[in-house]
C-alpha cells in the first residue's frame, strides 16, 4: 500500500490533518487509529453529561498509570488518554479553553518559533471553530468544531460562583477565550447545537470520510515507523487481533499524531531517542535525540467540595430513577441536563503579583463528585476544581518494552518544586475566600473537603499529596524548538530526520494556561498549512489584555 501521507493517531490533531490534506483530491492519506470507531449510538461518548463514563473502562481509554509519584506519597496516578476516532476529544470534559495569549507569545520568544505568537495563531483558532452565538475578532463562524456558549439560567450555582469570585475582588470576563482571559465567567464547550459531543471525529472526519483519497484503519496499533537511512518511508502496524504486521509506505511524509504519551513511545520503538534507553531493548538507533519523551508536563488539580443548602445541585441526576427522563430529553430533543458537560463557569486568576498572567484555573461544578464519576457525595453539594497552570515540574515517558501493546513508564514528578506547593496552598486559601462571599450564602453549607480543620501549611500539603489528581492535560514530550532537548522544529519536523513530523500536544514547549484540546486542534490547522506548502493565514490585528501593573485583586 502506498500513500502520500500516513497519519498515526486519529485524535484532536490527526483528524484535522487528515481532513485538510485530503481537501486536495490528488493527495492520498492513510489514517491509522489504534482504537475503534466513535460509535454515535453510544451515549457514553456522545452525551456531554456522561463524560465520566469513558474514563471508567478501556474501550475508549488507554487507562495508563504513572510510576509511583515520589512527591505524592508514591501514589500511582491515573493518566487517561482517548482511544478511538477523536482521540482524547472523544473522552475529554469538552471545555473549550484556548489558554492565555501570553502562553503563545512566550513560545514565540524562542529563536525559530517567532511565528507561534498569539496573533499568528488566533486565525487558526478561528478557522477551526463555529461558535453558536456567532463570529467576532476572536471566534470563528464556519469551522468544523461546534462551540456552545452557556446560556444564563441553567443553574443558579454557576452565576452565584462567578459573582462570588467578583465579590472577592477578581475581574469578571464575558469570554475566557476573548480579549481577557483573566477573571471569572462562562466557560465555552465543544458541544453541537443538538447537544452532542463535538469531537474532531464528528467535526472534521465527518466531512472527509467519504473522500476516495482518505483511507481510515481503526484497531490499527502502530508498531514502528520504517526508515531508509534518516528518512521515514512508512509505517508497520498490527491490525485487530492479528500478530502479522501490516505495512504501508509514505511517498511524502509520516505524520505522528499519537499524543503526548504515545508519540514519544512510538519514536523510541522506531529507534529515535536516547541511545542508552534504546539499547536496553536492543532497538537499533536510527537517530540520537535525547529530548524524546522528556519535558513531560501536566495540570494537577483538586476539588474543594461544599454541602448545598438549597436543592439546586445535580445530585438528583445521579439517582438511577431520574436518569431515563434525562436520557430521553437528550436523545430526542438534544436538551436538558444531558446536553451540558456541566462545567459552565470557571475562571483564571493570578495568585500573586509576580505572575504576569493567570497561574490558577477554576472549573465550577454543581455537584460533589470525582471527575471520573467515583466518590459521589450522597447529598446536595457543589465543588470547585482548582489547580496551578504552569508548574516548573517536569517528567518523562520512557519505553518499558518493544511490545507495542505494553504501556510506557510515565512519571510526571508532580509537585517536585517549592513553587508547586506555594501555588496550591494559595489556591486552597483563595478558594475558601471566594466560597465564603455573600453570593453563595444561601447555598453554602459545611465544607466537605478538605474540611475546615485542614488549615496549616503542613495539613494543606498532606491533603494535596493524598487527593490532588490529574486534569488529563499531558504535553511537551516532543517539544518544539532548537535547543539540545528539542525534538521538532517550528514546522513540526523531527530534527535530524526527513519525511517525519510530530503534530500534537507533545510539541508544546511549555504547557498552556487552560485545557489543551482547543490549542491541539489549532496546532493541527496551522501545521496542515505548513505541510501543504501554503502561505500562513494573515496575522490577526485583535487586541488582547496584558495585566502589566494591574493589581491581582481590586
From Swiss-Prot:
Catalytic activity: choline + A = betaine aldehyde + AH2; betaine aldehyde + NAD(+) + H2O = glycine betaine + NADH + 2 H(+)
Gene Ontology biological process terms, A to Z: glycine betaine biosynthetic process from choline
Keyword Oxidoreductase appears in the UniProt entry: yes
Matches recorded under PANTHER family: CHOLINE DEHYDROGENASE, MITOCHONDRIAL, GLUCOSE-METHANOL-CHOLINE GMC OXIDOREDUCTASE
Species per Swiss-Prot/TrEMBL record: Klebsiella pneumoniae subsp. pneumoniae (strain ATCC 700721 / MGH 78578)
The protein's name: Oxygen-dependent choline dehydrogenase
Cofactor(s) the protein requires to work: FAD
Keywords: FAD, Flavoprotein, NAD, Oxidoreductase
Family to which the UniProt record says this protein belongs: Belongs to the GMC oxidoreductase family.
Entry GO MF terms: betaine-aldehyde dehydrogenase (NAD+) activity; choline dehydrogenase activity; flavin adenine dinucleotide binding
Pfam families: GMC_oxred_C (PF05199), GMC_oxred_N (PF00732)
InterPro entries attached to this UniProt entry: BetA, FAD/NAD-bd_sf, GMC_OxRdtase, GMC_OxRdtase_N, GMC_OxRtase_C
Task of the protein: Involved in the biosynthesis of the osmoprotectant glycine betaine. Catalyzes the oxidation of choline to betaine aldehyde and betaine aldehyde to glycine betaine at the same rate.
Active site: 473 (proton acceptor)
One cellular-component annotation, GO: membrane
Pathway participation: Amine and polyamine biosynthesis; betaine biosynthesis via choline pathway; betaine aldehyde from choline (cytochrome c reductase route): step 1/1
Residues bound to FAD: 4-33
Enzyme Commission number(s): 1.1.99.1, 1.2.1.8
TM regions (residue ranges): none
Amino acid at each position: 500500500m502506498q500513500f502520500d501521507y500516513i497519519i498515526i493517531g486519529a485524535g484532536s490533531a490527526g483528524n484535522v490533518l487528515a481532513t485538510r490534506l485530503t481537501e486536495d483530491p490528488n493527495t492520498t492519506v492513510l489514517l491509522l487509529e489504534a482504537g475503534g470507531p466513535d460509535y454515535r449510538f453510544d451515549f457514553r461518548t456522545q452525551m456531554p453529561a456522561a463524560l465520566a463514563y469513558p474514563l471508567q473502562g478501556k474501550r475508549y481509554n488507554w487507562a495508563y498509570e504513572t510510576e509511583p509519584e515520589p512527591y505524592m506519597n508514591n501514589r500511582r496516578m491515573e493518566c487517561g488518554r482517548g482511544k478511538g476516532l477523536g482521540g482524547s476529544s472523544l473522552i475529554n470534559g469538552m471545555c473549550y479553553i484556548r489558554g492565555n495569549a501570553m502562553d503563545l507569545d512566550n513560545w514565540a520568544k524562542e529563536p525559530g518559533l517567532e511565528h507561534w505568537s498569539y496573533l499568528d495563531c488566533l486565525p487558526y483558532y478561528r478557522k477551526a471553530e463555529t461558535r453558536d452565538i456567532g463570529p467576532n475578532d476572536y471566534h470563528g463562524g464556519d469551522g468544523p468544531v461546534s462551540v456552545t456558549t452557556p446560556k444564563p439560567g441553567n443553574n443558579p450555582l454557576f452565576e452565584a460562583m462567578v459573582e462570588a469570585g467578583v465579590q472577592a475582588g477578581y475581574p469578571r470576563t464575558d469570554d475566557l477565550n476573548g480579549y481577557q482571559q483573566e477573571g471569572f465567567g462562562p466557560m465555552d464547550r465543544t458541544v453541537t447545537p443538538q447537544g452532542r459531543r463535538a469531537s474532531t471525529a464528528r467535526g472534521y472526519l465527518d466531512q472527509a470520510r467519504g473522500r476516495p483519497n482518505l483511507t481510515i484503519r481503526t484497531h490499527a496499533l502502530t508498531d514502528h515507523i520504517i526508515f531508509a537511512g534518516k528518512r521515514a518511508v512508512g509505517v508497520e502496524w498490527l491490525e485487530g487481533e492479528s500478530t502479522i504486521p501490516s505495512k504501508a509506505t509514505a511517498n511524502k511524509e509520516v505524520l505522528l499524531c499519537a499524543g503526548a504519551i504515545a508519540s514519544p513511545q512510538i519514536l523510541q520503538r522506531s529507534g529515535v531517542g536516547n541511545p542508552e534507553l534504546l539499547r536496553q531493548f536492543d532497538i537499533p538507533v536510527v537517530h540520537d535525540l535525547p529530548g524524546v519523551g522528556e519535558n513531560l508536563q501536566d495540570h494537577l488539580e483538586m476539588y474543594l467540595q461544599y454541602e448545598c443548602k438549597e436543592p439546586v445541585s445535580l445530585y438528583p441526576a445521579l439517582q438511577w430513577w431520574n436518569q431515563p427522563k434525562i436520557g430521553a430529553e437528550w436523545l430526542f430533543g438534544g436538551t436538558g441536563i444531558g446536553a451540558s458537560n456541566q462545567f459552565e463557569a470557571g475562571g483564571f486568576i493570578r495568585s500573586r503579583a509576580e505572575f504576569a498572567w493567570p497561574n490558577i484555573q477554576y472549573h465550577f461544578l454543581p455537584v460533589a463528585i470525582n471527575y471520573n464519576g467515583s466518590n459521589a457525595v450522597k447529598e446536595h453539594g457543589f465543588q470547585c476544581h482548582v489547580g496551578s497552570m504552569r508548574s516548573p515540574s517536569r517528567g518523562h515517558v520512557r519505553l518499558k518494552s518493544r511490545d507495542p501493546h505494553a504501556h510506557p513508564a510515565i512519571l510526571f514528578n508532580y509537585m517536585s518544586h517549592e513553587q508547586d506547593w506555594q501555588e496550591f496552598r494559595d489556591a486552597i486559601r483563595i478558594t475558601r475566600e471566594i466560597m465564603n462571599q455573600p453570593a453563595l450564602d444561601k447555598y453554602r453549607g459545611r465544607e466537605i473537603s478538605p474540611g475546615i480543620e485542614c488549615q496549616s501549611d503542613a495539613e494543606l500539603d498532606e491533603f494535596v499529596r493524598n487527593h490532588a489528581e490529574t486534569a488529563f492535560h499531558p504535553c511537551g514530550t516532543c517539544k518544539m524548538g532548537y535547543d539540545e532537548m528539542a525534538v521538532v522544529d517550528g514546522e513540526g519536523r523531527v530534527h535530524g530526520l526527513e519525511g517525519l513530523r510530530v503534530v500534537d500536544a507533545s510539541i508544546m514547549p511549555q504547557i498552556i494556561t487552560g485545557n489543551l484540546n482547543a490549542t491541539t486542534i489549532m496546532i493541527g490547522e496551522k501545521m496542515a498549512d505548513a505541510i501543504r506548502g501554503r502561505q500562513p493565514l494573515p496575522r490577526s490585528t485583535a487586541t488582547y489584555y496584558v495585566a502589566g501593573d494591574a493589581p491581582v485583586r481590586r
